[in-house]
């Protein structure tokens, strides 16, 4: 029997670095349409776009997507997912996968992977993905979120800072990584149990989440387990800047 799960794609117009991002055209289609089409190639039983903007709503309706209007005042994307799950009436044990609306090249296989990861680990409220880091500059880049997990694959913590801090190596130089230390970059795709989403909303943000601007820290703060696997396929480039947009356009318009 195949695993049943729902994909939700949050899509908002407000972006400081790339205004109007979900509706920017790539190969003649809005960016969010590319994401939706990739998600539909996964094993998801349902793919829903969640937005708080009528222009996105109308664009998504035009290409045939299931789309829902949500409140505009959510603290995080996870809060938005909780609203969608409640509106759809999903049961507490249902699995919802959050696929970011700015990843038009997202591999469908890793959407399936993160859902299966959560289904295989009933002790976890969240599952997510990571990939190895091989370059020192990525370790020191605050836009690359680092993650450390325990021997069972459960997250210990996430940080924008270098994690772990290799004291002896970094005291001498920061252009080389220490041997035997598995640095990993977090991939911002999550699978959640709906029951967890309802709890998440009721808690509100914690100081650690706000300091790092990482909403998954709210879950760890409250003792929720997050299971992590390395992605079976390298995730494609997301679109955060005009340079990213041009790179993706070249790939899809070639």
Swiss-Prot record:
GO terms for cellular component: cytosol. GO terms for molecular function: 3-deoxy-manno-octulosonate cytidylyltransferase activity. Its EC number is 2.7.7.38. It catalyses: 3-deoxy-alpha-D-manno-oct-2-ulosonate + CTP = CMP-3-deoxy-beta-D-manno-octulosonate + diphosphate. This is 3-deoxy-manno-octulosonate cytidylyltransferase. Belongs to the KdsB family. Activates KDO (a required 8-carbon sugar) for incorporation into bacterial lipopolysaccharide in Gram-negative bacteria.
